[in-house]
Each structure stands twice: as structure tokens, then as C-alpha cells.
A protein has these predicted regions:
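Short, cationic-aromatic polyanion-contact patches
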Residues: 4-9, 62-81
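Pre-recognition alpha-helix immediately N-terminal to the DNA-recognition helix
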Residues: 8-16, 28
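Short helix-to-turn junction characteristic of helix-turn-helix DNA-binding domains
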Residues: 17-21, 101
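Short acidic, hydrophobic short linear motifs in intrinsically disordered regions
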Residues: 23-33
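Short, hydrophobic-biased segments on the C-terminal half of alpha helices
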Residues: 45-49
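Glycine-centered, phosphate/nucleic-acid-interacting loop/turn motifs that mediate DNA/RNA or nucleotide
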Residues: 55
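Short beta-strand "wing" residues that participate in macromolecule-binding interfaces
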Residues: 59
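Amphipathic alpha-helical dimerization/coiled-coil segments
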Residues: 81-125
Length: 128
């Protein structure tokens, strides 16, 4: 299976499917999307059809209302998208990514503490 690279709209639908945690109908996905963005039912239907063709979701046609489920986990999609973003935006440099993320002082003290622990864990794994 290839690395998933969903569009922004496809990613919004995947977030809904991951949140619901079970196969969902177009109507269920549409209702959830309406909470944050005005989206037509037919648009959601068309996007899910395209996503099925792209192997981002699987369509279960055993019931009258087809149900859709993601074919990739949220961490797998995040990892794939991050690798592409890192390469395209920061020439593959994790240092430049972190430097940029921390440059505007948006990280809270708690987040900085957690980041420090992650760095220590990464260093420990490298020594082994």
C-alpha cells in the first residue's frame, strides 16, 4: 500500500471517520462535518467515492446505506504527511522544522517540558 497523501478536504473526512471510530454512512460523516463547516451532502458523497478509488477509505456495500472506514490509521497518515512536508518545506531537516515551530513562542511551558523529554528519549534510543 502506498503512503497516504490526502487533500485538505479528504483529511477533514478522515478526521471524522477516526473520531467516530466505526464505519460511517455518508449522512453521519456529513452531519459531523456540518459542525465546523458548511458542506453539501453531495460533496461529501463525491469525496468519499474519490477517497475509495484512491484507497484512503473502504466502502462496505453490504447494507443499503454504504458505510465507509479509513484504510490508514491517523498516526500513519500523520507520519506520511509529515515526511513529505519536512522534505518539501525544510529540505528534510528536522532541526529546521523544530526551530521554526519554536521561533514564535507558541509552545507552552508544559509543551516545552514534554518536548525536552522526547528529545532525551530520542538521544537514549540512538545510544543503544
Amino acid at each position: 500500500m502506498t503512503d497516504p497523501h490526502p487533500t485538505e478536504g479528504e483529511l477533514a473526512i478522515l478526521h471524522v471517520l477516526w473520531k467516530l471510530g466505526a464505519p460511517a454512512t455518508v449522512r453521519e460523516v456529513h452531519e459531523e462535518l456540518l459542525r465546523s463547516k458548511d458542506t453539501a451532502y453531495t460533496t461529501v458523497l463525491k469525496m468519499l467515492t474519490i477517497m475509495s478509488d484512491k484507497k484512503l477509505v473502504r466502502r462496505d456495500e453490504t447494507e443499503r446505506s454504504h458505510r465507509y472506514m479509513p484504510l490508514h490509521s491517523e498516526p500513519a497518515v500523520q507520519s506520511s504527511m509529515l515526511k513529505t512536508f519536512l522534505q518539501n518545506t525544510f529540505s528534510g531537516s528536522a532541526f529546521k522544522l523544530v526551530q521554526s515551530a519554536l521561533a514564535d513562542d507558541r509552545a507552552s511551558a508544559e509543551e516545552l517540558e514534554a518536548i525536552g523529554k522526547l528529545i532525551a528519549q530520542a538521544k537514549s534510543r540512538r545510544r543503544k
